[in-house]
């Protein structure tokens, strides 16, 4: 299954300011392709999910919370926000 990932400008800015790189982003995207309903649905948001994602080789302190929306019918994921 091919998915398109769309990042908000604030997601991209914060992603790199947290020290993550393009390889980490590819790892996150692959995880979401394999697990499109991962994370907890945030009540009252219409589908926004919050996911704790630990990156390989970075340990527990290298994890982040990612807020995203999956539109399965359109094969699109919107990466909304990231924080640690």
Regions found by a protein language model. Give the residues of each.
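Enriched for short, Lys/Arg-rich terminal
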Residues: 69-84
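Short, surface-exposed coil-to-beta transition loops
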Residues: 61-66
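Conserved catalytic network of the ASCE P-loop NTPase/AAA+ motor domain
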Residues: 58-60, 72
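Arg/Lys-rich, positively charged N-terminal/basic patches that mediate binding to nucleic acids
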Residues: 1-24
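Anionic group-transfer/hydrolysis microenvironments
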Residues: 9, 52, 83
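A short, surface-exposed loop/turn module that caps and links secondary-structure elements
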Residues: 31-58
């Amino acid at each position: 299954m091919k998915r398109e990932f769309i990042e908000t400008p604030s997601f991209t800015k914060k992603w790199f300011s947290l020290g993550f790189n393009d390889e980490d982003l590819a790892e996150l995207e692959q995880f979401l392709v394999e697990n499109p309903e991962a994370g907890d649905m945030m009540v009252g948001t219409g589908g926004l999910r919050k996911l704790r994602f630990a990156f390989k080789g970075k340990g527990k302190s290298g994890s982040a919370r990612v807020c995203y929306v999956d539109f399965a019918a359109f094969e699109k994921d919107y990466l909304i926000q990231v924080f640690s």
